């Protein structure tokens, strides 16, 4: 069995880090910087407990390098070929932001339009990242060494 997750969200939210954790390997370049790491939609996979996990990393909306239109165009083009194989749409949000924004609503609407599937809501997952940012320096060092 194969489970495929696509990460969607703003630049700097932790999409690549989340997908690396899901795959249990460093498949995608990730950093704590608010600048974009992901330039193009990319795919990687790993076999964990005899189950194939596939992850799709996407450039962020509000990207620091490309325009939103270019990133959305790139994503739509990619999805035309792969949308049927995606099991989970993960909207990745910064857990330190304490409110729901219009941008969050926009991401969910864009994802819903892109997939245009009657069961979309059953496959949507909201992921909150960056909880570790409240750690002191020693805790961060230990976390990075893990």
Roles of regions detected by a PLM:
Residues 1-146:
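Conserved GTPase G-domain substructure that encodes guanine base recognition and part of the catalytic core
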